[in-house]
Amino acid sequence: MASHVRLDGRKTTETRPIAISFDKLARADGSARFSFGETTALASFSGPIEVRLASELPSKATFEVHLRPLSGVSAADAKSLSSAIRSSLEPSLFLNKAPRTLAQLVIQSLSPSRGASWGDSLSAAVINASSLAIVNAASIPMRGIVCAVAIGSLSDGTLVLDPTDAETAKLRGTGCFAFMFADDIGEAGTEIDCVWTSWRSIVGGYDEKELLRAKEVARVGARTVYSAIKKSIQGAILGVGTAEQTRDEIMKTDESESSDDDEKMII
Amino acid sequence: MATVTTPITPLPPAPTSKLNHLSQDEQDALKAAVFQRLHPRAYLEKFLAEDVRPDGRSFDGFRDVSVNVGSISTADGSALVRMGNTTVVCGVKAEIAEPELDKEEEGFLVPNLDLPAMCSPKFKSGPPSEEAQVLSDRLNQALLASNLLPLKTLCIEKGKAVWVLYVDATCINYDGNAFDATLLAMVAALRNTTLPKATYNPEIDQTLCSRKTPRVPLKLSPSLPISMSFGIFDSKFVLADPTSFEEPLLDTTISIILGDSNQIVSVSQFGSTMLTVEEDGQDTRRDALAECIEVAKARRAEVANEIFT
């Protein structure tokens, strides 16, 4: 299985080259661009900002995610993905630190979505760009960083990380996994928590073992994404000055988590 | 000298005194209902601490399901599903259309779920809510992933005419877990669907259906997808088949779709599945996904026996 060679010469457990840039969209609090090879997404984050009265929440910030495809208006598939993104990023944010406000994430896909639905690698790029934009804004304290990768299963059972469009046509099963990475929590060092699973068969079904195997391969893949993200933050933001705060806020998770529990009990 | 021990003053007459015309049981029920409205989280926590859910189910208990097929005579196939109080009605309507140029032999399957204002005060009238759109898209993905209806079987004449199946579901009473109920209704409705015999006539470039020849059922794959959903509350409790009261309080939702012989068609999980369990005074964390899959397998067999045999 390990000897499987892919069309572009990658190993099965290798993603396409990851590129990260912070675009400094002038009117947003934070923005970032993330790509796996050609698959690119651009995310912008604003918050805490004023919230519409109808969606105001008394105990936490309202978290909105808007996803725009490369062409046309966003349809049901984009709505579905944006709700998945919201639920996978929400565990990483301390939204209760800014009640009665709005945290708004707008993501623009810079790659065409294949056919009727968003590809899994595009979904992964979208999530990674979103995490980076929120870190770049540094306005909402975070528990960890959510990183996602796409994964596919070939007809012989080989799992391939970050499948390209050409490979996707031959897949038997496909999916996307997102993990939340939090450094310095507990004794185990980095804590990794799966926050989004979407694993579907294309031909026939699969069994539990394959799901767990896929999740493990994805976990390793997500770790490479995490290192890339960490490196980009250290390189691009820490030099700027204000970003000291970002890092502090990410690191402060221990304290914030305990205070979060207190609040839960009061509510 | 004044008396030292004052008798305990009775509690000031609570506003409930207006409710004196009600029996004690009715007053208690009213108090519980008010508590549930004002503090839904605390209300649920109190039940779960006693190892039971507000509706009397165990944590991994599903609600009773009943399916009634063919009740809409104007549709080509239909089903009505009740899952506890959640009621979904689904009708299949067939039309003839031209196929897409790059998929000349494939028909179309268009599932849609409507959550009208009628089914719950949660929903507003007007254009489909975000929740309805998200559910419709997930249902579409589930039907595609399970390959229940191979789209090539909907071909009438290659490149000229194919069937379009509109699988429209409407929720008429919403009490949570609409996804499971709707998928069940759609599968049951597709099983109930029959199509007239259609022939394409190249001379007049039209497709003709005959009323005289008997209608034929769809060529469905024998592996019927059934979805089982779970929710995680407070990183501690895994609740199967959540109701509309439990749903907004959940941190995580998991949907597991199983086909025949427990083949997994799709697993989707939104939020973390790690549970914090107290063991020997220490908090340990474990993943709940594997146990959900086990519960789902047992449940799939039950539902399939009851409904699809």
Predicted regions and their residues:
Chain A
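Polyanion-binding surfaces on beta-sheet-dominated domains and ring/shell assemblies
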Residues: M1-I267
